[in-house]
Amino acid sequence: RSTARFRDLVEENPRGIWSAPGRVNIIGEHTDYNGGFALPIAIDRHTVVAVGMRHDGLVRVGSTLSDDVVTTELARCVPGAVSGWVAYPLGVLWALGGARGGAPGLDIVIDTDVPIGAGLSSSAAIECTVAVAANDLWELDLDRMQLATVGQRAENDMVGAPTGMMDQIASLFGVEDSAVFIDCQIPEASTVPFALAS
């Protein structure tokens, strides 16, 4: 769906498609911002983004869930200047340094089947998907833990939600049939076998 919406909006194919899952937490709720341990698992619901490059310093964000499209200058993607749901993807671009100049603009179309407002980290899935896409397209070479920090900064500073980064770590490190053990003090993440079906 994201590719079809992207073609409708941009009239060309995206440079790529990226995906990140939502999560369920098994143990360690509210421990991430207190330096404790957490054990979340990624779920089989995902956010998908179709992204293309621009050369005019603009970023345009659309969604399969709405006809609304937001277009702004990348340099204006700063805390206090953006509100609503687009603060999540635009906050990621800000946290990656896009507002400092030099980064190409982007066309972004977001699709998700992660239920919004259900405690499954739909916001982190958006942040992580956009972070991985921009990391690839802008050739930033950041690792997954650095991208988790980017998502947390977007949520804390752009959106204004005082969260830890368990959700982002779960989304970036989660794999099938495994949970993600997170030491939030370091921070550090490792996968452990956790097959719900068995």
Where are these regions (language model features)?
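Short Gly/Ser/Thr- and Asp/Glu-enriched loop/turn motifs at secondary-structure junctions
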Residues: S19-P21
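Short Pro/Gly-enriched beta-strand edge/turn motifs at strand-loop
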Residues: E29-N34, R153
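ATP-dependent small-molecule kinase catalytic core of the GHMP/sugar-kinase superfamily
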Residues: L140-S198
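Anion-binding (especially nucleotide phosphate/pyrophosphate-binding) glycine-rich loop
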Residues: R1-I17, R45-Q152
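Short, surface-exposed beta-strand-loop junctions and turns on beta-sheet-rich folds
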Residues: Y33, D67-V69, E188
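Conserved hydrophobic/aromatic beta-strand scaffold that supports enzyme active sites
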Residues: P40, V48-A50, A179-F181
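Short Gly/aromatic-enriched secondary-structure transition segments
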Residues: G35-A42
